């Protein structure tokens, strides 16, 4: 990863003050998607990092994880598996609940999407608390998949999600860190 490439990616991500509520500085990854060079550079960095690791599946979490996970899976020549909110997947699923700041949420995965021994890379746009990826990791492991790596475009290290995921045995990678919440 060159400093110039990381700078291109980071500068394409807009920061929105007081969204979705007062006191939050929201990192808007959709502005990165609008910049073809930055988006291509993001996928290119992820491909370069993971191309020789032998993954058999890439799992992306709803919804922005799809935007980075699916093109990465195509470039790696492996299948893409979406993890979604309840009721959004048509085939049989398993579910995993996790705690949010103000409540509980649940994620689901198709029961036939991961098979015993699949080597899985988990991808999302942003790492904050790590709750979403912890739940995703539990789903993959419950189906017999091996997951040791999680990749993010953005990390908010002050919130501590990277430490939470490392405690689960995940190697955490992010392209750029941002200060704050």
From Swiss-Prot:
**Location, primary (coarse class):** cytoplasm
Molecular functions (GO terms)? adenine binding; adenine phosphoribosyltransferase activity; AMP binding
Q: Does the keyword Cytoplasm apply?
A: yes
Recorded hits in PROSITE patterns, A to Z, give:
PUR_PYR_PR_TRANSFER
Subcellular location(s) of the protein: Cytoplasm
UniProt xrefs under SUPFAM superfamilies: PRTase-like
**Which PANTHER family does UniProt cross-reference here?**
ADENINE PHOSPHORIBOSYLTRANSFERASE
Family, similarity comment: Belongs to the purine/pyrimidine phosphoribosyltransferase family.
Q: What is this protein called?
A: Adenine phosphoribosyltransferase
Species of origin: Vibrio parahaemolyticus serotype O3:K6 (strain RIMD 2210633)
């Amino acid at each position: 990863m060159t400093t110039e490439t990381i700078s291109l990616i980071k500068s394409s991500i807009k920061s929105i003050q007081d969204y979705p509520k007062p006191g939050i500085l929201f990192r808007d990854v959709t502005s990165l998607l609008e910049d073809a060079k930055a988006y291509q550079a993001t996928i290119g960095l992820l491909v370069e990092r993971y191309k020789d690791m032998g993954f058999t599946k890439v799992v992306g979490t709803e919804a922005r994880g799809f935007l980075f996970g699916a093109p990465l899976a195509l470039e790696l020549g492996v299948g893409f598996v979406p993890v979604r909110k309840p009721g959004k997947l048509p085939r049989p699923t398993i579910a995993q609940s996790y705690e949010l700041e103000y409540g509980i949420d649940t994620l689901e995965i198709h029961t036939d999407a991961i098979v015993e021994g699949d080597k899985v890379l988990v991808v999302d746009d942003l790492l904050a608390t790590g709750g979403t990826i912890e739940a995703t990791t539990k789903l993959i492991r419950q189906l017999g998949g091996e997951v040791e790596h999680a990749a993010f475009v953005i990390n908010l290290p002050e919130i501590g999600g990277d430490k939470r995921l490392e405690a689960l045995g995940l190697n955490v990678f992010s392209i750029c860190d941002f200060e704050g919440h």
